[in-house]
């Protein structure tokens, strides 16, 4: 774990919503992007619990403390690899999932939970921007067309 006191030093922050009149004219994200520094602070709030209930709260069993730690340490490439270890489509699930992992976060017992959903979305966005996500082609040619 990168910062053992991150959850004490930093409160939960969420990205700002874009104004509704602006959002009505495009199909872009509802929230403004987080800065890298703000996201690292949020990732540092992960307590690396002995039994991380966020993993059990996630329907996919994502290794949430692992990629929170990697984001805190600025190891984005390893973070997307850790995310892809349990989730083939984080670009969809990160946005559509209602984040039961945040409800299961141990920090959420006494304070606001870690912003797990936002960290996941930002990992994926960074991976797309850096060109780390590439299509995986089938090894065997099937004659089935979609």
For the regions a protein language model found, what residue spans apply to each?
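Non-ligating segments of multi-cofactor redox enzymes
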Residues: 1-29, 36-43, 47, 117
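A short, ordered amphipathic alpha-helix with a cationic face
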Residues: 12-17, 32, 52-57, 69, ...
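Ferredoxin-type iron-sulfur electron-transfer modules in oxidoreductases and energy-metabolism complexes
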Residues: 23-41, 63-95, 99, 110-140
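Short cysteine clusters
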Residues: 46-49, 54, 58, 93-97, ...
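Short alpha-helical linear motifs
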Residues: 103-107, 141-142
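Conserved small/polar residues in nucleotide/adenosyl-binding loops
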Residues: 144-146
């Amino acid at each position: 774990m990168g910062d053992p006191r991150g959850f004490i030093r930093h409160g939960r922050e969420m990205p700002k919503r874009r104004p509704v009149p602006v959002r009505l004219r495009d199909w872009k994200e509802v929230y403004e992007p987080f800065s890298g520094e703000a996201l690292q602070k949020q990732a540092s709030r992960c307590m690396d619990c002995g039994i991380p209930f966020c993993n059990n709260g996630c329907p996919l069993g994502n290794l949430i403390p692992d990629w929170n730690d990697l984001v805190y340490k600025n190891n984005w490439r390893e973070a997307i690899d850790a995310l892809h270890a349990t989730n083939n489509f984080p670009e969809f699930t990160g946005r559509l999932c209602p984040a039961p992992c945040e409800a299961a976060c141990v920090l959420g017992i006494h304070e606001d939970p870690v912003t797990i959903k936002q960290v996941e979305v930002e990992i994926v966005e960074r991976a797309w921007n850096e060109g780390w996500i590439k299509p995986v082609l089938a090894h065997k040619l099937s004659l089935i067309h979609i």
